[in-house]
Swiss-Prot record:
This is Serum response factor homolog B. Residues 1-15, 442-467 have a biased composition (Polar residues). InterPro entries: SRF-like_MADS-box, TF_MADSbox, TF_MADSbox_sf. The keyword Oxidoreductase does not apply. GO terms for biological process: adenylate cyclase-activating G protein-coupled cAMP receptor signaling pathway; aggregation involved in sorocarp development; positive regulation of transcription by RNA polymerase II; regulation of DNA-templated transcription. Residues 206-220 have a biased composition (Basic and acidic residues). One of its GO terms (cellular component) is nucleus. It is found in: Nucleus. Residues 128-205, 222-245, 301-334, 347-392, 401-440 have a biased composition (Low complexity). Disulfide bonds: none annotated. Signal peptide: none annotated. GO terms for molecular function: DNA-binding transcription factor activity; DNA-binding transcription factor activity, RNA polymerase II-specific; protein dimerization activity; RNA polymerase II cis-regulatory region sequence-specific DNA binding.
Length: 467
């Protein structure tokens, strides 16, 4: 609703604006004496405990124009909303306008600007600021916890040298708490400033909606105050952000160091595992090479002992009992008949039991056995060092003989050219081609094949001549 305000520019003493018929009864709007064509009006300040009366001149700032305009909207009462030079907003109304504040038509007009108990000065923006305070406090509590944890974690790292090592934990915790408390205070101060700014902005919005003709000087001062408050708020916010950034950085640094240490530990574990696997592979290769070498040695031993299995000397009992050295020693050195029987018997008895433990043959033993002409037991010892003890097995159809042959040995006649030739030594035997030993008949022929169940790999030494 637009009114022609020019009709109130020149108000005489006998003129009356649209006020109540009896101003003394209806309100505090009273006529004053005429002074140079100007009319002054006393308006009561509603909401102030002192209930001050402020007088304004209608020609000074045009407030009367707004009073008349508002009176047409709310009845015969007068409502004024004035912004002071300090940026505060005052609401003025006649006494009978006060009940209209609770009504819907009055609420929609003045609820954002009138500071009364019925309408508390809390706006949506203020609510948001309160929520902001809560969020800031929550952040500060989180910072307290994080900073304390940081100090506790780094007490041993020399971060508290300035405290001379006295009560490092407590000093750090206290300093962290104090910093956080300061942050809380700064946040609260910022929010209070924001609340004031929001109130000012709301009041300015109300003034714009109600089209109040506030002087430009006051508007500019309000803007300056708002700008100053905004600058202060920005500075405080920046300071708070800096206070928050440093604890976060202090937390991130140990976390990064822990991650790097864990990665290094994992790399070390992987390197150790690879080294262990390499050692295992090397050990397996070494075992394979050792097995291969042992197999080669065993093959060589078998090749050496295999030759002794042949009845190259034609002397069956000597080969069967004493074995390996027949190829090298017994071809040219055939002992007498009776001595060979005794030596082969003793050799198989004494050396056969222990020969199982010796799987490798040293060919040097041939020389040793050949030189011990006077020791019958040396034959059995050398037989123990032969390749396989299985060569000392007696024929299956033979019973174990007694240690010493009880039968008398036959006499040994002189050699004769007509006798059968044994071996390569030129020695001739006058006996028949077969002989009896424990009931076992064996042909005595040079070219007769050896029985498969007679031991072949025992050692035969040169028979002593004086036995």
């Amino acid at each position: 609703m637009e009114l022609n305000m020019n009709q109130y520019d020149n108000i005489e003493s006998n003129d009356s604006p649209p006020t109540p018929s009896s101003p003394g009864e209806e309100g505090n709007v009273e006529k004053k004496e005429k002074k140079s064509g100007r009319r002054k009006i006393n308006i009561e300040f509603i909401g102030d405990k002192s209930r001050r009366h402020i007088t304004f001149s209608k020609r000074k700032s045009g407030i009367m124009k707004k009073a008349y305009e508002l009176s047409t909207l709310t009845g015969t009462q007068v409502l004024l909303i004035v912004a002071s030079e300090t940026g505060h907003v005052y609401t003025f109304a006649t006494p009978k306008l006060q009940p209209l504040i609770t009504k819907q038509e009055g609420k929609t007009l003045i609820q954002a600007c009138l500071n009364t108990p019925d309408v508390p000065p809390v706006s949506k923006d203020d609510g948001n600021n309160n929520n902001g305070n809560n969020s800031n406090n929550n952040n500060n509590s989180n910072n307290n916890n994080s900073s304390n944890n940081n100090n506790n974690g780094n007490n041993n790292n020399g971060n508290t040298n300035n405290n001379n090592g006295n009560n490092n934990n407590s000093n750090n915790n206290n300093s962290g708490n104090n910093n956080n408390n300061n942050n809380n205070n700064s946040y609260n101060n910022n929010n209070n400033n924001n609340n004031n700014n929001n109130n000012n902005n709301n009041n300015n919005n109300c003034k714009e909606e109600q089209n109040m003709n506030i002087p430009n000087e006051r508007k500019s001062k309000n803007n300056i105050n708002n700008n100053n408050n905004n600058q202060n708020n920005n500075q405080n916010n920046n300071q708070n952000n800096n206070n928050l950034t440093q604890p976060i950085q202090n937390l991130q640094l140990p976390l990064q160091q822990n991650i790097i240490a864990q990665q290094q530990q994992q790399l070390n574990q992987q390197a150790a595992l690879q080294q262990q696997m390499t050692q295992q592979i090397d050990q397996k290769l070494y075992n394979l090479q050792l097995q291969q070498q042992q197999m080669q040695q065993q093959q060589q031993i078998q090749n050496i002992s295999g030759g002794s299995g042949n009845n190259s000397n034609g002397y069956i009992n000597g080969n069967g009992m004493n074995g390996n050295n027949n190829n090298n020693n017994n071809s040219n050195n055939i002992p007498e008949y009776g001595q060979v029987i005794i030596q082969s018997y003793r050799g198989s008895n004494s050396g056969g039991n222990n020969s199982s433990n010796n799987t490798s043959t040293n060919t040097n033993t041939n020389t040793n056995t050949n030189t011990n002409n006077n020791n019958n037991n040396s034959n059995s010892s050398n037989g123990n060092n032969s390749n396989n003890n299985s060569n000392n097995i007696l024929p299956q159809n033979l019973t174990t003989p007694s240690p010493i042959i009880s039968q008398p040995l036959p006499s040994i006649p002189s050699p004769s050219s007509s006798s059968s030739n044994i071996g390569n030594s030129g020695y001739s035997s006058p006996f028949s081609t077969s002989f009896s030993y424990g009931g076992y008949q064996q042909p005595f022929s040079r070219n007769y094949p050896l029985q498969s169940n007679i031991a072949t790999n025992s050692t035969v030494s040169k028979a002593p001549s004086d036995l």
